[in-house]
Amino acid sequence: MKLKKKFLEKSKKIAEERIDVLMNLAEKESKDGKADRSKNYVLLGKKIAMRMRMPYPKEWKRRICKNCGSFLIYGKNARVRTKAKNYPHVVITCLECNSITRIPIKTEKK
């Protein structure tokens, strides 16, 4: 039983490293203007995470459009705005498919 647990921990660590490498490649390709290759890297990273049954890293999850799967580069193919109407939040708009992602901002309670 210990061997299996050790093997799973090691394979999850390898999967995290591969996802990180793929997302860095996706960022590089997206900056160079090769959006289709960037989407392929994102899909590969998602497949690895699903196969290993592990959550996608939060720092990368927010850089991917949930609707079209493109890698978001703020200012190039994504727009970022802060709003404070009902509750303070950040609005990220994908400029390729016009989907909106809202991320709440935690405020201090007085």
From Swiss-Prot:
An example Gene Ontology molecular-function term: ribonuclease P activity
Needed co-factor(s): Zn(2+)
GO CC terms, sorted: cytoplasm; ribonuclease P complex
Disulphide bonds in the chain: none
Main location: cytoplasm
Keyword entries, A-Z: Cytoplasm, Endonuclease, Hydrolase, Metal-binding, Nuclease, tRNA processing, Zinc
Keyword Nuclease: yes
Catalytically driven reaction(s): Endonucleolytic cleavage of RNA, removing 5'-extranucleotides from tRNA precursor
Cofactor binding mode and count: Binds 1 zinc ion per subunit.
Domain of life: Archaea
Catalytic activity, EC: 3.1.26.5
Known role: Part of ribonuclease P, a protein complex that generates mature tRNA molecules by cleaving their 5'-ends.
PANTHER family listed in its UniProt record: RIBONUCLEASE P PROTEIN SUBUNIT P21 (PTHR14742:SF0), RIBONUCLEASE P SUBUNIT P21 (PTHR14742)
Name this protein carries in UniProt: Ribonuclease P protein component 4
